[in-house]
A protein has these predicted regions:
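Acidic/His-enriched low-complexity segments
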Residues: 1-147
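Hydrophobic alpha-helical and helix-loop surface patches within well-folded domains
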Residues: 75, 109-261
Length: 261
């Protein structure tokens, strides 16, 4: 998807929205100079149906009821961030909350479609999330640079996840398991959670100048996520999965005629 995405849940006909900005797609949601080295502060005000939740990069400043059975959500200003990691997610999402207490206290949220509420296992997601924060704060020597951390399962998503600052979107089937899955799927979910979390420091706080260095952004997050999985969580075999999947994938890419130094 590109820009602001719209979907209807066939289970209850509820509408869900989410944004996707990377690479230069957020300009389809609002006018901007959509390049990573031009950063600004953002403050969203959103009018939405009264039964909807609205999520953005920053915490909610206020929510007030207005005529027409709607609420007006006002969010706190963001720190200076690139346009492509600004986010707007809205709909009647089911949600659960927790907090991480480390260098600072970080409110945590997990969101999914209402129809998937029974399939969500927030305990394991929160556990990996807290372990990731603890590990990265220690390794990077810096506290988490934003004010809250929400993780949202969205439908019709083209990627595994997207590292919007404070409001990470995930491919729904990667975050919410609707049936019994293998340990490999738990490994994949944890790796994705940690990959996106690593971007909060490297990619969101420290950002490449132009899109041709996006590979460095992603490579660092990929390395960091496997390191954090192996050293900071119960998933100590993370490097085995890296060698059997990522390494072979890189070898295949190197053989393509389109690959160049």
């Amino acid at each position: 998807g590109e820009g602001l995405q719209y979907s209807v849940d066939p289970a209850d006909n509820e509408v869900y929205l989410y944004s996707q900005g990377e690479t230069a797609y957020i300009r389809k949601m609002y006018p901007c100079f959509d390049q990573p080295d031009l950063k600004a502060t953002f403050q969203l005000t959103v009018t939405a149906p009264a039964h909807w939740e609205v999520i953005s990069n920053s915490p909610v400043k206020s929510k007030n009821a207005v005529e027409g059975n709607k609420n007006v959500w006002e969010f706190l200003p963001t720190p200076r961030i690139s346009t492509y990691i600004t986010a707007l997610i809205a709909g009647p999402y089911y949600h659960v909350h927790n907090e991480y207490v480390g260098e600072k206290t970080v409110p945590l949220g997990i969101y999914c479609r209402k129809s998937l509420a029974e399939s969500l296992d927030p305990e394991d997601i929160f556990l990996v999330t807290k372990q990731g924060f603890s590990y990265f704060e220690k390794v990077f020597g810096l506290a988490y640079p934003f004010e809250k951390y929400d993780q949202i399962a969205v439908v019709d998503f083209n990627w595994g996840a997207m590292e919007n600052s404070g409001a990470v979107t995930f491919l729904e089937n990667l975050l919410v398991f609707r049936s019994k899955v293998t340990e490999r799927m738990y490994d994949a979910r944890a790796n994705t959670i940690l990959h996106e979390m690593a971007h909060m420091w490297f990619g969101n706080m420290v950002t490449m100048q132009w899109w041709d260095d996006l590979w460095l952004n992603e490579s660092f997050a990929e390395w960091s996520s496997h390191l954090a999985s192996a050293e900071g969580t119960r998933l100590v075999t993370a490097w085995t999965g890296f060698n059997s999947e990522r390494k072979n994938w890189a070898y295949r890419q190197d053989q393509l005629s389109s690959t160049h130094p």
